[in-house]
């Protein structure tokens, strides 16, 4: 009995601390092509580097000068993953009026995510923003390094 008391006192002096660490993800280097056509639909290409893995990514196709928290419901869209680490590339198909017809992306080690559509209000200059999710936890908003402007030239052919 005395031995159990000694063991109990020893164990009560010891503590075990478990810390749950969010594995996280990091989106960096988000860029888009610089123009879209005003005479027809354009696939606005984008690319970014992903560290970690995403379960979902949100897209914000908003007027230049606004932030994602100001985006209206129709200006945002989410694609479910998984989206694997590495260089991620994709496109948003937009009309001259600013409507997003589809979003698609591919990441290393996964099949492309099927195009899905959303409609946005027509505004000329826009910027793409992203936010990734891992394990249901939202990461920070990531702003594209450049904004996208309309091109009304008759030979419009946006290059990546």
Regions found by a protein language model. Name each.
Residues 1-14:
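Sec-dependent bacterial lipoprotein signal peptides
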Residues 14-160:
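Non-catalytic macromolecular-recognition regions in eukaryotic signaling proteins
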């Amino acid at each position: 009995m005395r031995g159990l008391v000694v063991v109990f006192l020893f164990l009560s002096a010891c503590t075990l601390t478990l810390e749950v660490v969010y594995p996280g993800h990091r989106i960096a280097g988000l860029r888009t092509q610089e123009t879209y056509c005003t005479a027809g639909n354009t696939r606005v290409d984008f690319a970014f580097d992903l560290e970690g893995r995403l379960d979902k990514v949100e897209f914000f196709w908003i007027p230049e000068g606004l932030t994602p928290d100001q985006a209206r419901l129709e200006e945002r869209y989410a694609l479910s993953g998984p989206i694997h680490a590495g260089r991620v590339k994709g496109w948003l198909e937009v009309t001259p009026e600013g409507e997003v017809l589809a979003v698609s992306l591919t990441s290393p080690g996964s099949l492309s995510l099927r195009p899905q559509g959303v409609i946005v209000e027509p505004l000329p200059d826009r910027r793409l923003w992203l936010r990734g999710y891992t394990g249901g936890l939202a990461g920070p908003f990531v702003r594209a390094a450049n904004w996208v402007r309309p091109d009304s030239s008759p030979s419009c052919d946006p290059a990546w």
